Amino acid sequence: MGDDTSAWRFQKNSLPQGSVLAPTLFNLYTNDLPATKSRKFVYADDICLGTQASTFVELECSLTADMARMAEYCQRWRLKPSVTKTVASVFHLHNANASRELTVMLNGQCLKHDPKPVYLGVTLDRTLSYKEHLLKTAGKLKTRNNLLTKLVGTTWGANANTLRSSALALCYSVGEYCAPVWSQSAHTNLVDVQLNSTMRLISGTLRPTPLPWLPVLANIEPPALRRKAAVDKLLEKAAEHEDWGLHGDITNPPPYRLSSRHPLWKDLEPMDTTARWREEWKSASVVNSNLVRDPAIRQPGFDLPRRKWCLLNRYRTAQGQCRACLKRWGQATSDLCDCGEIQTMSHMVDVCPLTMLEGGLQTLHQADDAAVEWLSDM
């Protein structure tokens, strides 16, 4: 600093675990990794070698040769690769060889074969269906939904604003981790089921509630649209960075051969999430959809106390504690109202002379003072 030069210091205990400096220095130190036939994928101190071939023998020869080059490099620069932490995996659709293991050598030792390796937090499987990863993610979401339930009570529960912020931080951050990688999987419904439960907690709605209502009332875009937005964002970044490995895959993609596969570069057209959401809501055939003109805006009553917010949404979705619903669920023997008509949620607010609200469901949806007072009496 200035005219002074700092003295050399020998670090004997390496660097703290989890520090930013450690992977930065490692990347600088290993910036001249040797050329290999395999493609190298490096993130911090995780290095992955990936290659393609038409036979298992070719794969084994290529990877073993590349591992020998890496081992020589490590020995030259006083690095010691961990044989126990290094694994070999193979991805293919040939079911007859589903149990086939690769024989890849490193420093004279055969690497362990892992059929379901975890790389950067994503569990891979032989066919790259990501089913195992999505099962794990769904399990994590279920646990987090249980935590979110602690904030939900019929009388004292947190308001929708608090629940929405908590859900985005606690649940959606996990449910959408590396979403562009597995967004085209056939098993995304495993995650969607749990995210639907998250939105039910925010909106206070019941399980029979039509699914298109959940994102509208929770004021969160549908999971599929959020994943597509994440894919578009990644593709936009990859197109701008020519030094990214993904850039070449997008600008010069391999031939599209299998109809069961849906790679990211199959659909490069960016999507307007809000416009698509509005189109889907307009085409959705759900009860009382005429109440909502724009699904992307926060619906009236979002700041109401928990009990009134839940009750309001159950009238909106026509799924609540009316006798018609209770009879359908096996909780009541009769579906008749005290006025003699069949008691549905719309009957209670629109028609019933004992409980009707002046202006009906349209007035209730606006959640004005009269509507809130009516909800208090129900």
Spans of features found by a protein language model:
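Basic, alpha-helical interaction scaffolds
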Residues: 108-181
